[in-house]
Amino acid sequence: MSTLNIAVAGSSGRMGRALLEAVERAPDMRLSAALERSGSPYLGKDAGELIGSPCGIGITDNVDTALDGSQVLVDFTRPDGTLVHVDRCREKNIKMVIGTTGFSPRQKEALWIASRDIAIVLAPNMSVGVNVTLKLLETAARVLNEDYDIEIIEAHHRHKVDAPSGTALLMGEVVAKALGKELSEVAVYSREGHTGEREAGSIGFATVRGGDIVGDHTVMFAGTGERIEISHKASSRATFAEGALRAARFLADKRNGMFDMQDVLGLRQ
């Protein structure tokens, strides 16, 4: 069994630590680098100490040297930082698994351009369960059509900085596409005051932030006399970390291109 050398960006964060633990558990992977932002109090420390198991890999903010010897960089950071990492990976021909959310259209375009040269899995949610849920939503939207009003409710921990979540937006995109629409044309992101009646065919979003909620998503199809709710609730970041490593394995034999978890899981039709 060949070993895949994995670099982790944002290694001291909540997802970073979950990734370190997942790499340590994986028999076919080895931690090759642990990255942190400049000024982080964790710089210079053994990355393994973050999860109670020293590994001999020091945490660094030097992207160039850290990526030497790595095959895949797993990045759950923030858009600006991810774009810096993309440029370095492109220079060094290193594949990327990107779980960062909150990209602007221009930033997404930069990722697509980079994928001409390197292989990238870009997914706002790496959970296997969420990606199965997306297939269920696609089927439900196609069958129920516009006879049902669609609302998407998501909840996350108090530290999340973007809203709606990338997963909620992806769910909206899947549903809108199944209805033959663009999400940008039908999305309603806030309601306040005298809003008037609900506009037919719109897709509403509601956001909750609080506590340590890992991630809850519910898509409601509300019809006359009945309501269908399709939900996914994450109780541990380990599910996202395991999905990210599955994505890294998928990229092992890919030279370039943009992929998502539907590709990784073989759900693409």
From Swiss-Prot:
Pathway: Amino-acid biosynthesis; L-lysine biosynthesis via DAP pathway; (S)-tetrahydrodipicolinate from L-aspartate: step 4/4. It catalyses: (S)-2,3,4,5-tetrahydrodipicolinate + NAD(+) + H2O = (2S,4S)-4-hydroxy-2,3,4,5-tetrahydrodipicolinate + NADH + H(+); (S)-2,3,4,5-tetrahydrodipicolinate + NADP(+) + H2O = (2S,4S)-4-hydroxy-2,3,4,5-tetrahydrodipicolinate + NADPH + H(+). Transmembrane segments: none annotated. NAD(+) binds at G10, S11, S12, G13, R14, M15, E36, G99, T100, T101, A123, P124, N125, M126. It is found in: Cytoplasm. (S)-2,3,4,5-tetrahydrodipicolinate binds at H157, G166, T167. It is an enzyme of class 1 (oxidoreductase). The active site is at H156, K160. NADP(+) binds at R37. The keyword Cytoplasm applies. Catalyzes the conversion of 4-hydroxy-tetrahydrodipicolinate (HTPA) to tetrahydrodipicolinate. Belongs to the DapB family. HAMAP family: DapB. This is 4-hydroxy-tetrahydrodipicolinate reductase. It comes from Nitrosospira multiformis (strain ATCC 25196 / NCIMB 11849 / C 71). The lineage of its organism: Bacteria, Pseudomonadati, Pseudomonadota, Betaproteobacteria, Nitrosomonadales. The gene is dapB.
